[in-house]
Amino acid sequence: MRVLGLFERGNNLNFADTYVYTWNQQYSYHENAFLISNQVATTIILYLDGININEVNKAFELLNSNGIPALIIKPDHIGIFTSSNFTYDWQYKIVYFHEYTYYKNNEFIVSDEFWLYTNINELLPYKILYYERGMRELYAGREYTLYNTATDDDILYKYIYEKDSIMNGTDYKKLYDTNSVKNFVHFMRLLRMRFAVPFDQLSNRITRSRVFSKSRIHIGLRNESIPQALDNIHSQWINYSANGIVISELKGLGSYSEKKISEFGIGQFKNYMNFLTLMFYIKNMKKKPSCTIIGAAPGYWISSMKKYFTIVTYDNKEVDSTEHHNRYFTDDDIVNVKTNGVYIDVRSEFKTNDWRQRRKLIEEETIKWLEISYKLLENKRVEAILLKMTAMDGEIPDGYCVHSPTTYRKSEYYLLIDKHIIKRQKIKVTKSLMYNAINTIYSDNVFISGKYSLRGKTEGVLALYCLSNTINQKEKVIQYANSFSGTCMTVRLNNTYEVDKIIDFKTNSDHTFLPSDFTCSLNTILTSYRGYAGIFGYAITKDLKSNGNNHIYIIPNARDENNFDTFGSHLGLSRYSHSKRFSESATTMSGYIFRDMVSGKENMQDTDKDNYASGHVFNAIAHYRFDYTYDIVGWLRLHKTGQFKVKSDIYKEHTDSEIRNAIESAYVYYLLDGDKVGEKYSKKMMEIWEVQV
């Protein structure tokens, strides 16, 4: 949802799913904010004439801090604000739309400039446009700044990594006769326009920036964090991604199997991924990364990296780098290398048609550059090297096997080594071992590191989307969360009907958790993505759905001790239950009647007056488990310890019997729904309350 304030009245009811809210002058800004937040319409319009604007601003501030975007807009912007989802940076008054109507103009938006230098424009019937970070400014004024951030980057990534499985799918085959990139992009755009805009992905690009800059230890970084990692490259941080395969871990046998991976050239993509892999590997050594690139041309991606790294290049063709040597690298240059990283991407043009002779020359050249790498690592400045290798028999260092996709899969892969790796025992490899790796492994993450241990201090830790992984024991994750004092961590929310559900993905699986599993510090907030966004200065328009991809965000030191409702509060609590009541129930009072029936009350004449507020507790437990924005666990614990504070003119303290009745009602609700997870959840809530009692 979104709340839009307008000083000028207009024909705004023509927009679908829009509600005009009438400000109640008899209520405080706090109560008006609550009433606004529980409207079931997507867009809430508030006309501001005749209203105390200071009260409106306070209500909007409360909505925004709870992750519900509320702002006063210009009348001529009503169209885009009501028709598009967006992420609102309410601290700096910046609106980031996630808006794909540029498809009408036959445009294809990318955020990496090197795509402009491929033949992709010849294969697609669209105009390929590049914008740094995908950001297009739509409006800049005193009120706010508007950007559109939607891109087609994810379609390119899916083509590179997932096109075979997608094109072999039944739906694709029913629609298209050929497996072309043109048809693939058309298919992915069809899916997008079929109400499948990747909102979380687009919004996370924005909201991740603030939490990244506040953190020193990052757990589970993946490629979507590349922009934030680059922006913070000169600050102190390291990452743990449990990612990367070393040579000694390779298994299986294979043979040479050339395959065209992409219709358009992705050699620049491969080099960009390889370069970042090396740079972030050195970053994890607590060094300021820099790089010498040997065999750099054409290097269309290098110019955009100069702002983050010192890049020295060697090639007989021109390259836009920090320092370019317009010649080939020689042994004499080894002592002059001043960067701590070296990327070697050399393959000579051998003038022979004899494939055996060519293989012999390639292997000899590979050995030569491997020997040069050893010498480079004797240079006190050089910390790590990523070099091109080929499948061959022999002994090589037990470094990381890096194999980012390129246009044609042949015999090449890359080896990441450092000073420590080359001192360890070398690994004997065979052609067939390496061909199997080349044919089956594709590197999809530029962050390579060891596994994070759930021990020790947690200050400065940011762990988004990873600690739920089954490589960690569930009980140890709960213990870790209970003492967590970092920036933010997440676990996957169990909004299924299966107790202790484990969710499987392509390469791993996740435990699922309930908010009632945790006993964190009272100043720690447990909430949803929307609540997390509000805490860090953002608000989102998308209504949260129970789709198996929901997380519990655990955020220490976030509680406003003087006003519980500032963050992760009951704002928006009734939207879900309102929708169910109006579509499935005979009365809006059904929840309260249900509660009183469970309690055994025979005279329910005053159901709409007595204990009205405790309906919130029932609502929070019975309906909000599937999203968990309202931190009802924190509410229960604070309430009974006498530490609960809220700036509200209508709040009344609940009695012990009211709370018990609300929790029992939620239990019966789940029982009748056949929801075993809900039964467990409500029982645990009663345990939490009784401990506090």
Curated annotation (Swiss-Prot):
Please give the PROSITE patterns that the UniProt record associates with this protein.
Answer: SAM_MT56_VP3
The record's HAMAP family line, in alphabetical order, gives: Rota_VP3 (MF_04124)
| Assigned keywords, A-Z | GTP-binding, Host-virus interaction, Methyltransferase, mRNA capping, mRNA processing, Multifunctional enzyme, Nucleotide-binding, Nucleotidyltransferase, RNA-binding, S-adenosyl-L-methionine, Transferase, Viral immunoevasion, Virion
The entry sums up its family as follows: Belongs to the rotavirus VP3 family.
Q: Spell out the coiled coil positions from the record.
A: none
Quaternary structure note = Interacts with VP1. Interacts with VP2.
Keyword flag Iron: no
What reaction does this enzyme carry out catalytically? a 5'-end diphospho-ribonucleoside in mRNA + GTP + H(+) = a 5'-end (5'-triphosphoguanosine)-ribonucleoside in mRNA + diphosphate; a 5'-end (5'-triphosphoguanosine)-ribonucleoside in mRNA + S-adenosyl-L-methionine = a 5'-end (N(7)-methyl 5'-triphosphoguanosine)-ribonucleoside in mRNA + S-adenosyl-L-homocysteine
Start and end residues of each stretch annotated as GTase/RTPase activity: 560-693
Give the organism, scientific name: Rotavirus C (isolate RVC/Human/United Kingdom/Bristol/1989)
Instruction: Please report the name of this protein according to its UniProt entry.
Output: Protein VP3
- From the UniProt entry, list the residue stretches annotated as the region N7-methyltransferase activity: 187-255, 433-559
Q: What is its main location?
A: virion
Any idea which GO molecular function terms this record carries? GTP binding; mRNA 5'-cap (guanine-N7-)-methyltransferase activity; mRNA guanylyltransferase activity; RNA binding
Q: What is its EC number?
A: 2.7.7.50, 2.1.1.56
Its localization reads: Virion
Q: Where is this region: 2'-O-methyltransferase activity?
A: 256-432
Cite a GO CC annotation.
Answer: viral nucleocapsid
Pfam families with a match to the protein in the record: Rotavirus_VP3
Major enzyme class? transferase
Example GO biological process: viral process
| UniProt-listed InterPro entries | VP3_Rotav
Instruction: State the function annotated in the UniProt record.
Output: Multifunctional enzyme involved in mRNA capping. Catalyzes the formation of the 5' cap structure on the viral plus-strand transcripts. Specifically binds to GTP and displays guanylyltransferase and methyltransferase activities. Has affinity for ssRNA but not for dsRNA. Capping activity is non-specific and caps RNAs that initiate with either a G or an A residue. Together with VP1 polymerase, forms a VP1-VP3 complex positioned near the channels situated at each of the five-fold vertices of the core.
